[in-house]
Each structure stands twice: as structure tokens, then as C-alpha cells.
Swiss-Prot record:
Involved in maintaining Golgi structure. Stimulates the formation of Golgi stacks and ribbons. Involved in intra-Golgi retrograde transport. PANTHER family: GOLGIN SUBFAMILY A MEMBER 5 (PTHR13815:SF7), GOLGIN-84 (PTHR13815). The keyword DNA repair does not apply. The gene is Golga5. This is Golgin subfamily A member 5. The chain crosses the membrane at residues 696-716. Highly phosphorylated during mitosis. Phosphorylation is barely detectable during interphase. The lineage of its organism: Eukaryota, Metazoa, Chordata, Craniata, Vertebrata. Residues 152-167 have a biased composition (Low complexity). One of its GO terms (cellular component) is Golgi membrane.
Length: 728
């Protein structure tokens, strides 16, 4: 209940603030004249208070009603002590406090607690006094008839009494409206309420009568009324607290009851489910017991039938075992004969294959020797050609050197002639200048001479001048011609020098290239010679290995032929005893093991041979690349390798044997077609392996084909026919 106490404390603080505000407002309004209603008749006021309706509102209405009540109470106190005349209000103003007083408070927290005063004995005496309500009413009526207008003190006392009564009734009715269920069962009886109301009314009347004689008695009665009001408030508060606790308990019990009901309902549902499940299980158990009983009867019948069938089966199995033993004995004899024949055939085939492989290896070795001889001859021819080319280049270089020397000599001669021409030109210029100077001197002397000479002298001088001018023009033309020749010789000399420099550089480059080619040819020749030596050694090793394998295979073939002969003798002389059969079986097992071992040896030898063949092919490719590298014109003629039988350089597994292709019918044709396809694919692979250019072309062709297919797939859009279906 901590929140309840906190709420009560907050309400008390709020009431204290409201009291302070009301006191300040009353002090400001003490100068103004306020009038109360003329209805001083207490029974009418009491009836109006008892018959007024109570309205519920928000907390602001409760606070305003409490503030109005406190304001009215303090107004009566101030009017009684200071003898302030208070007028009657208007009808709307008189009814306003009653309406606000009639509004019930939500709880007793708005009732302000006050300290108990010392005159408790007087309060109890006053409460135990025997004054009655009707006499008070009569006296009030008489006094009303005597004096129509009461003094301000009497009206204020009556208004204070009415407000106190209304506040008490409002608090009681509020508590009753908050807990209607509890008040109906646990609240005070109505007689007690009426007695409290009558006592309050009688107290109000006594206060009214006592307020007429003097102010001291009125203050005493007011204090008594305050005490009584405080006691009533305390009682109402205690009752409210009890009612709240009872309400809380009732709510808790109601919640517990609801929870218990929910639990009971859950238990009932669970019990009903469990009952239903048990019924279903019982029904299933009954059905299963009936089915088990039916199946037991069926099992008994089936057991009898099974016993009969077992007897029939046992008899039949005995007969079958006898037949199978005979069949196995016959099949064993047949298998032994066929296995011996197969072994003989296999040994013969292996012998033929070994001979064929030996022949092929010998032929391939011979071909390789011939190819190497041809390659060596070609290399020697190429070396001779290169030597001749080097000698020719040296000759060309010497000739070019000679030409360069001749050109240099010509240049020197041209330079000397040019210098001599320049010297002659300078000398001629000097001579011409001297002649001109002498002529000018003559002309000047002639001019200075007497002008009285005859016409002959003047004509002679004029003729000489014309001749000199003509000579001068001729000299100028010759000088221009010589200058043109000099320029031409200079340009020719520059061209010759540039040509000489370019020819010298080209000759140097050619010499450097030739020297590089000679060095490369020498290095490649050394490498090829080393490779040839190594390959010769490898061929020797291969020949030795082949001879060894041939000898071992021949010895094995002889051993197998001896074993076959022994087995044939044993087959002709075999007996039907168990001991001879066991010996034959052990012998067959030994033969099969030896065959398996020999097959593994043959496979290992074939793998070694294949590896050697691969090494040879790699060396051939290196030789081919070395031969085609320095001289693009040189090539190896391998036309004789692909032609003829036995030209395969490695032991590629054939799909079918050549001995089995001679069979007639569809089976033989299929074998022939498969073997021909196999041979073609092997030759194609060898061709692509030997010629890398063909491989490059095939790769480019496949890439272009795939690219074209992708372009077609991505760019092709099918034709969309927008015709309607059903031929419309």
C-alpha cells in the first residue's frame, strides 16, 4: 500500500496549496461586497443538500470543488471574527457551491488531516447533548418570521454549517460510490447515518442560536464543529481504507477463483482427452488381438503346408545336387581341355606378336638409321653451303672495300681538281682586275688629254671600251659556269660520301650476320653431334634390351611348349582318381600364376618400350626444330615412314587382333571397320604430333568453328508466324 500512502501525501500537499491560494484570494477580496442567498432556512437548505444529484468529473472538478468549500469555510470564519457584512449572492452563485459540494470526491485523500485540539471533553459533552432537530427547525422558523434579514454572522454560520454538512455527505457518498459491493455488505447501517446527520444538524442549529448572543460562544462552537468534522473525516478515511483493503482482497480472491476455474477446465479437458485416448487404445488392442488370433490360425495352416513343401524341396534338392555334381564333373573336364587349348593358343599368339614386334622394331631401327644418315648428309651439305656463302660474302666484302678505296681516290682527285680550278679562278680574277685597272687608267688619261684630238683617237678608245666590256661579260659567264660545276661536284662528292657510308654499314651488318650464322651453325652442329652420339648409345642399349627380351621370350616359349606337351601327355594319360584331379588343379593353378607373372613382365617391357619410343620421337622433334630453325629451306623427308606395314613406332593397343579379322559374316566386317578406324586415328595422331603447323591449323579451325556457331546461336532469331491457329 505504499503507492496509496504516496497518493494521499500528494493530495494533502495539493490541498495545502489550494488553501494558501484561497486565503490570498480572500484577503484581496475583503474590500468587495459579496452577498449570500436569502435562504437562511436550515430545513430547506438541508433538503436541498439531501436532494441534490452528485456528478462525477475529472480531477480538476474535484480540486475546484474542494477549493470552493474551503473558501466558503474561511469566509464564514473571517465574517464571524471581523464582523464583515456579506450580501446574498444571486441564484446562480448560490447554487454553484452546492453543485460543487455535491460532486463526490474519488477518495478520502482530499480530506485534509488536522491536529486534535485540547477541548476533547467539550466535544464529547456536545455530542452527548439531547437537542432535537424539530425544535431547532421551529426556532429557526420563528426567528425567520421575526427578523427577515439576519445579520452577516448568522448567515455566515449557517452557510458554514451547510457546507460542512454537504462536504461530509459528499465524502460519505463518494466512498459509497467507490465501493458499492462492499458498502452493501460491510458499511454502516442507515440508522447510524441518519443519527450522524441529525447530530450535525442539531449542532448547526445550536451554533446558530449560540452565535446570536456573542462572538466568543460562536468561536467556541466553531471549534467544536471543527473537531467534530475532523473526527468524522477520520472515521470516513478509516472506512475508506477498510473498504479499499476489502476491495483488494475481493479482487485477489476473484482472480484466484478465475485461475482455479481455468485450471479445473484444463484438468477436465485433459481428463476427457486421456479418456478418449484410452478408449481408442482399448479398441485398437481388441482389434489387434482379433487379428493376431486370425493370423495364428493362418500360421498353423501355413506351417503344415511349409512342412509338406520342405519335404518336396528336400527330395528335389537331392536330385538337383546329384545332377549338379555330374554336370560340374563334366564341365570341369571340358574346362580343363579348353583351358589347355586356350593356353596353347595364347602362347602361340604371344609368340607371333613378339616376332612381329621384333620385326617392326628392327625396321624402325633401320629407318631411323637411314633417316639419321640422310640428316647427317643434309647437315654436311648445309654446312658446305654456309661455308660457300661465307666465302662469297668475304669476296663481296673485299670487292666493296676495293670500290670504296677507288671512290675515295676519285674523291681525292676531284678535290685536287676543284682546288686547282679555284686557284685558277682566283688568278684569273686578279688578272682581270689588273687589266681593268690598266684600261681605266688609260681611259682616264685619254679623258685628261686634249679634247682637240681627232676622231680616230675617240673611235679607237670607244672600240677598246666595247672590247673590254665584251671580255668582261665573257669572263663573268665563265665564272658562273665554273661556280655551277663546283656546286655540282660538291653535291656529287656528298652523295658519294653518303653512299660509301651506307655501303660500309651494310657490309658490316652483313658480315656480322654471317658471323652470327656461322657461330649458330657451329653450335647447332655440335649439339646435333652430341645428340647423335647419345641417340646412338640409346639405340645400342635398346638393341641389347630387345635381344635380351627376344632371348627371354624364346626361352619362355620353349618352356611353355614343353609344359603344353607335358599337359597333353597328362591329359592323354590322366585317370579318374581324386588324387590325379587334385594334382591337375594344383598344376593348373601354378600355370595360371606363371601366366599372370609373364603377362605382367610383358606389360612392363611394353611400357618401357613405349617410353623409349616417346623419347625417340621427342629427340626427332628437337632435331627437326634444330634443322628448320637456322635454314628455313631445309626439311626432312618422312614420306617413307607412314607407308607400308610395320611402320608404327610405338606399341599402340589395337582394338582387335589382325588374326581375328579374317572371320566371315557381319562380325568380321565390324572387326575390320573398327581396326581400320583405329589405324586411321593412330596415323592421324602421329601426323599431328610430327607436324606442329598442322596442329596449329586444326586448333585455329576448331576455335573459328566454335566462334561461328556461337555467333549463329546468339544472333539467329526464328521467324515468328503471326497466323491464327486452326488455319484461320
Amino acid at each position: 500500500m505504499s503507492w496509496f500512502a504516496d497518493l494521499a501525501g500528494r493530495a494533502e500537499d495539493l490541498l495545502n496549496r489550494v488553501d494558501q491560494g484561497a486565503a490570498t484570494a480572500l484577503r484581496k477580496e475583503s474590500t468587495s461586497n459579496t452577498f449570500y442567498s436569502k435562504n437562511t432556512d436550515y430545513p430547506e437548505l438541508h433538503q436541498q443538500n439531501t436532494d441534490s444529484t452528485y456528478h462525477t468529473g475529472q480531477k480538476a472538478n474535484y480540486i475546484s470543488s474542494a477549493a470552493d468549500n474551503i473558501r466558503h469555510q474561511k469566509a464564514t470564519i473571517i465574517a464571524g471574527t471581523a464582523n464583515v457584512k456579506v450580501g446574498s449572492r444571486t441564484g446562480g452563485d448560490a447554487s454553484h457551491p452546492t453543485e460543487h459540494a455535491s460532486v463526490p470526491r474519488p477518495s478520502s485523500h482530499f480530506v485534509r488531516r488536522k491536529k486534535s485540539e485540547p477541548d476533547d471533553e467539550l466535544l464529547f459533552d456536545f455530542l452527548n447533548s439531547s437537542q432535537k432537530e424539530p425544535t431547532g427547525r421551529v426556532e429557526i422558523k420563528k426567528e425567520k418570521g421575526k427578523a427577515p434579514v439576519l445579520p452577516s454572522s448568522q448567515s455566515s454560520a449557517v452557510s458554514s454549517v451547510t457546507t460542512s454538512v454537504t462536504t461530509i455527505k459528499a465524502t460519505e457518498e463518494n466512498s459509497g460510490s467507490q465501493s458499492p459491493e462492499v458498502s452493501s455488505s460491510d458499511s454502516m447501517p442507515e440508522g447510524h447515518k441518519k443519527s450522524t446527520e441529525e447530530s450535525t444538524v442539531s449542532n448547526a442549529i445550536s451554533v446558530e442560536h449560540s452565535s446570536v448572543p456573542s462572538d466568543g460562544s460562536m468561536s467556541h462552537e466553531l471549534s467544536n464543529l471543527r473537531l467534530e468534522n475532523q473526527l468524522l473525516r477520520n472515521e470516513v478515511q478509516s472506512l475508506n481504507q477498510e473498504m479499499a483493503s476489502l476491495l483488494q482482497r475481493s479482487k485477489e480472491t476473484q482472480e484466484e477463483l478465475n485461475e482455479a476455474r481455468v485450471r479445473v477446465e484444463k484438468w477436465n479437458v485433459d481428463n476427457s482427452k486421456s479418456d478418449r485416448i484410452t478408449r481408442e487404445l482399448r479398441a485398437q488392442v481388441d482389434d489387434l488381438t482379433e487379428a493376431v488370433a486370425a493370423k495364428d490360425s493362418q500360421l498353423a495352416v501355413l506351417k503344415v503346408r511349409l512342412q509338406e513343401a520342405d519335404q518336396v524341396l528336400s527330395s528335389r534338392t537331392e536330385a538337383l545336387e546329384a545332377l549338379q555334381s555330374e554336370k560340374s564333373r563334366i564341365m570341369q573336364d571340358h574346362n580343363e581341355g579348353s583351358s589347355l587349348q586356350n593356353q596353347a593358343l595364347q602362347t602361340l599368339q604371344e609368340r607371333h606378336e613378339a616376332d612381329a614386334t621384333l620385326k617392326r622394331e628392327q625396321e624402325s631401327y633401320k629407318q631411323m638409321q637411314s633417316e639419321f644418315a640422310t640428316r647427317l648428309n643434309k647437315m654436311e651439305v648445309e654446312r658446305q653451303n654456309l661455308a660457300e656463302a661465307v666465302t662469297l660474302a668475304e669476296r663481296k666484302y673485299s670487292e666493296e672495300r676495293k670500290k670504296v678505296d677507288d671512290l675515295q681516290q676519285q674523291v681525292k682527285l676531284h678535290r685536287s681538281s676543284l682546288e686547282s680550278a679555284k686557284q685558277e679562278l682566283v688568278d684569273y680574277k686578279q688578272k682581270a682586275t689588273r687589266i681593268l685597272q690598266s684600261k681605266e687608267k688609260l681611259i682616264n688619261s685619254l679623258k685628261e688629254g686634249s679634247s682637240f684630238e681627232g676622231l680616230d683617237s675617240s673611235t679607237a678608245s670607244s672600240m677598246e671600251l666595247e672590247e673590254l666590256r665584251h671580255e668582261r661579260e665573257l669572263q663573268k659567264e665563265e665564272i658562273q659556269k665554273l661556280m655551277g660545276q663546283i656546286h655540282q661536284l660538291r653535291s656529287e662528292l656528298q652523295d658519294m660520301e653518303a653512299q660509301q657510308v651506307s655501303e660500309a654499314e651494310s657490309a658490316r651488318e652483313q658480315l656480322q650476320d654471317l658471323q652470327d650464322q656461322i657461330a649458330k651453325q657451329r653450335a647447332s652442329k655440335q649439339e646435333l653431334e652430341t645428340e647423335l652420339d647419345r641417340m646412338k648409345q640409346e639405340f645400342h642399349y635398346v638393341e641389347e634390351d630387345l635381344h635380351r627380351t627376344k632371348n627371354t621370350l624364346q626361352s619362355r616359349i620353349k618352356d611353355r611348349e614343353e609344359e603344353i606337351q607335358k599337359l597333353r601327355n597328362q591329359l592323354t594319360n590322366k585317370t579318374l582318381s581324386n588324387s590325379s584331379q587334385s594334382e591337375l588343379e594344383s598344376r593348373l593353378h601354378q600355370l595360371t600364376e606363371t601366366l599372370i607373372q609373364k603377362q605382367t613382365l610383358l606389360e612392363s617391357l611394353s611400357t618401357e618400350k613405349n617410353s623409349l619410343v616417346f623419347q625417340l620421337e621427342r629427340l626427332e622433334q628437337q632435331l627437326h626444330s634444330a634443322a628448320t630453325g637456322p635454314s628455313s629451306g631445309s626439311s626432312i623427308n618422312m614420306s617413307g615412314v607412314d607407308s607400308g606395314e610395320g611402320t608404327r613406332l610405338r606399341n599402340v593397343p589395337v582394338l582387335f587382333n589382325d588374326t581375328e579379322t579374317n572371320l566371315a559374316g557381319m562380325y568380321g566386317k565390324v572387326r575390320k571397320a573398327a581396326s581400320s578406324i583405329d589405324q586411321f586415328s593412330i596415323r592421324l595422331g602421329i601426323f599431328l604430333r610430327r607436324y606442329p603447323i598442322a596442329r596449329v591449323f586444326v586448333i585455329i579451325y576448331m576455335a573459328l568453328l566454335h566462334l561461328w556457331v556461337m555467333i549463329v546461336l546468339l544472333t539467329y532469331s526464328p521467324e515468328m508466324h503471326h497466323d491464327q491457329p486452326y488455319g484461320k
